[in-house]
């Protein structure tokens, strides 16, 4: 399901009590389970009865806006700015109107721009289920401001001393006392990730993002809104998201050149056929030096011969430069050394090497001059978290497993094969304990959810133990109206290879 969500994180000590709309309540239930019951004092006297007027939101967030797939389909010409910047947000209006302009003034840019800074828009076409915006303002909010409307009571509590109603005061506080690198953080994520990310935002996630905020603020202080970002903010949603086509197509628009989000990278020494990965999956991987200009390569070549330490320093700086200007896009950077990625501002999601160096030497048989440097890189990789295999192909499979787990929704399309995918939906859910989703994907079989299935796809029902899941009315209607191919298979007693072969022949 495609949807857009805005979340505002006030602080760890903030508690928001309010009546939740049905849509927002549903979103919280997806993330955290049922919301807590109202506090005893959160009641309002209605004639002779006391009626609860507030529910305790289970995390320190305010939902600014929530639009589901139906809304997007009904309003395909709406832009991201139209949706998240709309007055229909469910947060207290005063908080929204105070915080957002302050952030906009601090960054000299529309607040939503930051969401695209973290690879929300991708040129490689992964699924994007949710656009989540998280904002962390400075300390200094009033202790217990209250907002009352006809239908609900909202209570916002913190350890602060500035009244949220006083827009001038809060703007002044933010402008004077907020370090820009702490002012805001943005991230695209799937609905099931919202809970986990909210729990670590103030800690691990925020600390990892700080170097990129510094660069972002520096760039914003020197110029105006990049044209590509401005275009992205005002581009109709229908041009940014594929909606229920049953097949995830690459996005038509390219916005990566001005996108400065944190890149992901893996460490893979020489002789491990990293070029094979980047050429076979060009939309997923990119070699660390690919964006380097001829001038940069020439300067690095000179330093490599005269000053190795200066060479490595400049190498990391060059990577950092191209991370900032978006040259790597949304692809995973393959590097020979950990230091190049970490010093270049790239998040390392995996370290890999072939367990027997003799295999590496065989891979370098046509390049004997690189064996010594390859061995140095190979020996430098050790410790917990290192993934090894003596077979190059099997090691590459482990890399792909890591990529798909760190980048939800990524579609691994073999660049050497036809792009036509078989679209399959397993009625009772994908049997992941028995079969490998990665193997199906690598063989051109895209597994989609029931609400994404079109009549061009295949519906698979298992004859094994029924893994019944609750089917909302909309999905039940989808099943009854499905006119595509249906097949019954004993998936629990088939090997993954047999399942792939069967699906490929349908």
Swiss-Prot record:
Pfam families: Phytoreo_S7 (PF07236)
Organism per entry: Rice dwarf virus (isolate Fujian)
Annotated compartments: Virion; Host cytoplasm
Protein family per UniProt: Belongs to the phytoreovirus protein P7 family.
Organism superkingdom: Viruses
GO molecular function: RNA binding
Main location per the UniProt record: virion
Keyword terms: Host cytoplasm, RNA-binding, Virion
InterPro entries the UniProt entry points to: Phytoreo_S7
Keyword set includes RNA-binding: yes
Task of the protein: Probable component of the transcriptional machinery present in the inner capsid. Displays dsRNA binding activity and may play an important role in the sorting of viral RNA and virion assembly. Together with the RNA-directed RNA polymerase P1 and capping enzyme P5, forms an transcriptional complex positioned near the channels situated at each of the five-fold vertices of the core.
Protein name: Protein P7
Signal peptide: none
Disulfide bonds: none
GO cellular component: host cell cytoplasm; virion component
